[in-house]
Each structure stands twice: as C-alpha cells, then as structure tokens.
C-alpha cells in the first residue's frame, strides 16, 4: 500500500491529489518499489563511499524521482558489477569533479590546476543550511586527501558538520584534517579552501592523468621548499571515531511526561553539560571505545544506571568537541607533555601557595585546569599552548592566553604575586619553565611548583627561600614519574 501511495502521489506535493482510481496505478507502485530496492542494493555495497559527488547526485536524483531502472536480476548484476569494478576509476573522477566545481568567477582559482587557495560557491542556502549537492565536493576532497595520508576514509561523514561549524565561525580560518586543509566560510554561501602544498601537487598529478596537456609540469611536482604556514599532523583519530563524536547527544535534564495518564519521568541527570552516544553500543564497539577515551581525556565522568551510560562535564564541552571534529586529533601527550594534575596533588600545592584576596596569580601551563580550577578565576591568568585545552579553559570561565609560555614570558610586561605551576618535564623543560616563571614573580611574591624528583638537590632559584616536600610516587596515571613539591619565596 505504501508504494502505491508514494509512487502515485509523488510530485503532487499536496496541491493536487489524484482520483482514488489513480492511486492504485501499478506503474507508480513499481517505480516506488524499484527506487526502494536500488537504494537498498547500493547501501549494501561500499560503492557510495567511492562514488564521486556527481555520480552520487545522479543516482540520488534517479531514486528520488523514481526513475531508476527496473530492478531485475540481470540489470542489478550488471550495474553493481560495473560500479564495484570502477572504484579505482572513481578516484580520478572524484579529483576531476572537485576541480570542475571550483568557481570560475574568482581569479584565485587557476585554470591550470589546483593551487594553494581555492573558492567554491553556493555551499549554503539563504538560511545557512548546507547545499548537499555542493558540499559533496568538499567531502570528495577530504576522502582523496585521506587516501594520500594513508587514512581509511570509511566512515567519513562529518563534512556537513564541519562546514556548519565553519559557517558559525564565518570569516575565521579553521584548520581541519590534521592541517591538510584550511577552510573559511562566508555568510553569502561561499567557502575558501587552502590545501597543504604536499596535497595540491598530488591532486594536480592525478588531474594531469586525465588531461595530460592541461597541467604544466611545475604544478605536478612536489614543492622543494617547506611550507611555513602549514603544519601537517599524521597521528589523527579514525573517521569512524570522529563520526561517533559528531553524533553525540545531550540527555534531557527536565522531567518528561509522555501523556496525561502517566506520571512525569525524572531525568537521569540534572547536569546540562552531559553527552551520551547515539544508537546502540554494538553498532561499532571499537569506534565507541575510542570515542569514550576522548571524552574521558576532556574531563568527562562516565555515569550509568544499569546499562544506560552517559558522560558529565563541569563545563560546556561543545566547543572543545567541535575543535576535535575540525583538527581530527587530540593534543599529543608527548609534544605537549600533558599530564593533568590530580586533585590530591593540586589541593596540596594550592594549600601551600595560600592565595589571598587581591593577589594576582599565574598558571603558566594550565592544561585543562587541574590547578587553575582551584585558583580564584578573577585573579588568575592562564597560559596554555594547546588550542583545544584553551577552549576547555574558556568554557570553564578562566582568563586564557593561548601561547607557548617560553615564548610569551620574555615579551610580557605582566608580573604576578603568585605563580602556581605543573610544567612539562621532558628535555629539561621543567627547569626552563621554572626560570621563565620566576622572572614573572613580583619581589616578595611566591612560586609553587610540581617538579621531577631530584630537583630538590639542585640550587634552582639562587637567593630564594625554598622548601621541598618528600618525593611522591604514582601521582600521574600511566607514568612512573616521581615528583616533589616546591614552595619558593622571592626576596623583596
């Protein structure tokens, strides 16, 4: 019955309902049935993952308009076989389609191939909604670049979410996919794209395969000089994990009454800063397990009632989660030396620092606020190198400066009554950070720090009045680091 109605009402849009006799015309029902079967058949294979945007649009239009071929065995076998064996060919078609989609009205787009900056038009409609026929080209570009980077593009379905974030941040360059792409969206519906030079020449190399005489040789060679404005990262989260994170939902925090006869059902949480996974846990358990680690690393606390689980935060995680969607990665622990201060250790250090009302304070390696959360926000300046961690700190209400502390300290004219810090330890950075922080302490001020064990045997701050705690083990999960607490007073 549904196919009779869908097939014979299609196109009427409610303005004209055909006679009842027409509702049961067989051709309309068969057209609806054909479209439904073709949709299911294509979804059962991975050809949609490989199809370039133009082919996807063509198939989607045939199915939507119910003009798909008859769903007969010979036709289905022949069509699916051809599509499956064309997957390699689709790769070059995808690159060609991306190039042809570039705006011809902007001189930034060069006719001889892909350049560093490109412009695509009509990506959003007048209401700011993604134009899916056009955003598919950006999706194709991301999948091609993913292949260049050795990433599995299966599950890459976050492009429209990313473009929506870009539009919400109109006029701002945002970096995506580990630095492979930069995107700037505009309210009029246009986006500007910047491609990493290592990716642009590879795209041109494929384009030259299709159009040998059109692409000059210099555009098909790897750049000899390293790009100064691009930093390419390769330790990226799988797209399947990013997809799970992109689908996170917020659990209701108010009682719900489904009907008048039923008592209101209380919410499982009253914390508005909560997130839960969409769907069932067995859909992609590996991706969900990795996504769970991401939420925990952002400070989420896993809660449950029987089998139902969700995560609660003490800040709004929306912007931090958006940044992960964009960059495709978490900050590297090794690079940023991010080992968050435990509650016990932070409380001990802040108790010794004894911050008083009106004193100006500095946390020079703030991370996600392990120490700063215990310091008076109105009196405290946080410095943090990781953009993602800065988003978390801002969401918590901290005053944040996004900078490398060792680069910021020599140029700032700010001085502080109290510095509280847990600096990175590797490659002598603890001492470098300590010395830089000491220069920012006012005369008569004080500094409280967590440092590697053994630091107490060195005269790190000559002329200061220093006291040290006993060595402490097991204070940072997953490490064998032994630490000491330093309390140092600068002479007047």
Predicted regions mapped to residue ranges:
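Class I S-adenosyl-L-methionine-dependent methyltransferase catalytic core
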Residues: 1-492
């Amino acid at each position: 019955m549904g196919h009779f109605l869908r097939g014979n009402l299609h196109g009427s849009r409610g303005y004209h309902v055909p006679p009842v006799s027409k509702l049961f015309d067989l051709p309309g029902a068969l057209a609806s049935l054909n479209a439904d079967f073709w949709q299911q058949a294509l979804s059962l294979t991975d050809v949609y993952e490989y199809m370039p945007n133009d082919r996807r649009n063509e198939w989607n239009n045939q199915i939507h308009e119910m003009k798909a071929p008859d769903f007969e065995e010979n036709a289905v076998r022949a069509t699916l076989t051809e599509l499956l064996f064309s997957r390699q060919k689709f790769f070059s078609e995808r690159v060609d389609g991306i190039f042809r989609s570039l705006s011809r009205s902007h001189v930034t787009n060069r006719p001889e191939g892909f350049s560093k900056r490109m412009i695509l038009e009509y990506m959003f409609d007048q209401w700011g909604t993604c134009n899916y026929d056009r955003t598919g080209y950006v999706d194709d570009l991301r999948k091609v670049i993913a292949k260049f980077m050795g990433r599995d593009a299966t599950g890459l379905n976050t492009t429209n979410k990313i473009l929506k974030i870009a539009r919400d941040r109109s006029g701002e360059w945002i970096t995506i996919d580990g630095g492979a792409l930069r995107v700037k969206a505009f309210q009029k519906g246009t986006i500007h794209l910047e491609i990493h030079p290592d990716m642009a020449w590879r795209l041109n190399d494929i384009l030259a395969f299709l159009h040998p005489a059109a692409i000059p040789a210099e555009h098909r060679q790897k750049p000899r000089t390293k790009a100064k404005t691009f930093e390419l990262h390769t330790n990226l989260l799988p797209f399947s994990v990013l997809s799970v994170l992109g689908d996170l939902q917020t659990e209701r925090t108010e009682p719900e009454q489904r009907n008048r006869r039923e008592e209101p059902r209380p919410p499982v949480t009253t914390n508005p800063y909560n997130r839960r996974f969409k769907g069932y846990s067995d859909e992609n358990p590996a991706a969900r397990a990795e996504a769970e680690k991401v939420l925990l690393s952002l400070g989420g606390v896993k809660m449950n009632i029987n089998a139902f689980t969700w995560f609660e935060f003490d800040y709004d995680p929306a912007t931090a989660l958006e940044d992960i969607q964009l960059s495709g990665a978490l900050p590297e622990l090794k690079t940023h030396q991010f080992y968050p201060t435990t509650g016990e250790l932070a409380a001990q250090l802040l108790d010794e620092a004894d911050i008083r009302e009106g004193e100006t304070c500095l946390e020079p390696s703030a991370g996600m606020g392990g120490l700063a959360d215990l310091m008076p926000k109105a009196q405290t300046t946080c410095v943090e190198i990781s953009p993602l961690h800065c988003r978390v700190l801002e969401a918590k209400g901290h005053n944040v400066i996004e900078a490398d502390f060792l680069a910021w300290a020599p140029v700032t004219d700010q001085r502080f009554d109290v510095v509280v810090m847990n600096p990175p330890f590797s490659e002598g950075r603890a001492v470098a950070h300590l010395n830089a922080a000491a220069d920012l302490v006012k005369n008569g001020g004080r500094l409280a720090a967590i440092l590697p064990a053994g630091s107490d045997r060195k005269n790190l701050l000559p002329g200061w009045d220093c006291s040290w705690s006993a060595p402490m083990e097991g204070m940072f999960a997953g490490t064998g680091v032994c630490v000491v607490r330093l309390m140092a007073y600068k002479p007047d």
